[in-house]
Amino acid sequence: MAAAAAAATVEAVGVAGGRRRRSGSVALGDLLRREASAERASASASAGAGGRERERRPSVAAGQACRAKKGEDFALLKPACERLPAGGAPFSAFALFDGHNGSGAAVYAKENILSNVMCCVPADLSGDEWLAALPRALVAGFVKTDKDFQTRAHSSGTTVTFVIIDGYVVTVASVGDSRCVLEAEGTIYHLSADHRFDASEEEVGRVTECGGEVGRLNVVGGAEIGPLRCWPGGLCLSRSIGDQDVGEFIIPVPYVKQIKLSSAGGRIIISSDGVWDALTVDTAFSCARGLPPEAAADQIVKEAIASKGLRDDTTCIVIDIIPPEKISPTVQPAKKAGKGLFKNIFYKKATSDSPCHADKDQCTQPDLVEEVFEDGCPSLSRRLDSEYPVRNMFKLFICAICQVELESGQGISIHEGLSKSGKLRPWDGPFLCHSCQEKKEAMEGKRHSRDSSSRNSGSSE
């Protein structure tokens, strides 16, 4: 009956228009069949495109090696993680944790940091939206991990270097001095920051302004020895997870860099300071060139121990991002390392033995590794102040760090001047719960929770 009525309606329209077009009459059943057929064709095309996209994605192979001295280094290798809810392309996650003053913080971070980061990513994002949300989620996940661990009243701490690989996009978040380095098409790129006080005058200034004291260890006679350290506690790092006995100004806010590799792929090395205190970056890559990841990591650790002995836990993770057309990874000979922070893109750098040195005309179009995102600012307010995708507005009324749901009047805006606002308005967010706001204030030096102690005391690292 409904189909007949629909056909009659189509025919009547033809008559009203002054022309009788029985050939234009279409039954509702035919319309539905055509629409279903079109949807099937569209779904098939999408599936084919998705399959082709998966075929174009690189494979990821990884291996690790460790020689223990104190038993405080830990590694996380998850080459195939699934985004939830299911449907998105899989990603890989790798992390290195170099603990100090005990292994508690390193073990806790290894067990919790991935889930803490992922719970800060809104659900149902497209691939590009998911990648764009990662830098903020990494900041929130690191701070949540630190905040939750400190409720356990442990005095240990840990560095964290956390790597997420999605296709050719690599996102790295780091606190501490466990460096992450990439070699792509013969060029070396530094993807992490060094948070030792000796490496950053800005971090020395930040900690001092927040109430900490930075100096070297005093010995008998008034001489100062060793690296710069923060007192109380004697920690030589300005950022870490844990370290409750040192001070809240030792913050867990990570340096984050996101890059996109060319289709040539590349090799990544993540190592604790047991490796980097013994080997240069060039040596680490060259001594393991041509080896698969597991053997490469083992070789790098062996070289480090042969150079300086086993003075500390020595851990290495090697990750190969392999283009689909390559059966096995091929790592190009290394050129001079690019160092420091890069803006927008990385350019290949030639050394004296590079073909570019002999013929500059052949190097006018260098291959690029695109920098998508970079931020190492210690301000939690700035690092969390980025918008969610519009279709995930409901997340605005959840604490940006611990992800608890906020009721009316409970949330505190991260923006200055709005922290005492009673009624939540979407444009005032993101928001923090009261306990996360206290954590933020302590990290900024607005609330001191530790007593000072002498620089003559023992050191944490």
From Swiss-Prot:
Organism domain of life: Eukaryota
Annotated source species: Oryza sativa subsp. japonica
Residues at which Mn(2+) 2 binds: D98, D273, D312
Pfam families assigned to the protein according to its UniProt record, in alphabetical order: PP2C
Inducing stimuli: Induced by cold stress, salt stress, osmotic stress, hydrogen peroxide, abscisic acid and jasmonate.
UniProt family annotation: Belongs to the PP2C family.
Taxonomic path: Eukaryota, Viridiplantae, Streptophyta, Embryophyta, Tracheophyta
Protein name: Probable protein phosphatase 2C 40
Cofactor note: Binds 2 magnesium or manganese ions per subunit.
Cofactor: Mg(2+); Mn(2+)
Subcellular location: Nucleus; Cytoplasm
